[in-house]
């Protein structure tokens, strides 16, 4: 399962885009989105999801 970004809570700071090791986070239109075909929840390389760990707003990057 991939992660998603709750657009209404996102501050559009861009931290998640630069932190994602798989390049799954991109700015599309007016918001950041996570490509579910690229997101693997950082399994195999990290103890936590990198997008969620750098997000300044709790519960903005969540399981889809």
Curated annotation (Swiss-Prot):
Key words of the record: 4Fe-4S, Electron transport, Iron, Iron-sulfur, Metal-binding, Nitrogen fixation, Plasmid, Repeat, Transport
Every 4Fe-4S ferredoxin-type domain range: 2-30
GO biological process, one term: nitrogen fixation
Pfam (any one): Fer4_7
Coiled coil: none
Cofactor(s) required for function per UniProt: [4Fe-4S] cluster
Domain of life, per lineage: Bacteria
Residues holding [4Fe-4S] cluster 2: 20, 39, 42, 51
An example Gene Ontology molecular-function term: 4 iron, 4 sulfur cluster binding
Binding note for cofactor: Binds 2 [4Fe-4S] clusters.
Binding locations of [4Fe-4S] cluster 1: 10, 13, 16, 55
PROSITE patterns associated with the record: 4FE4S_FER_1, 4FE4S_FER_2
Protein name as annotated: Ferredoxin-like protein in nif region
UniProt organism field: Rhizobium meliloti (strain 1021)
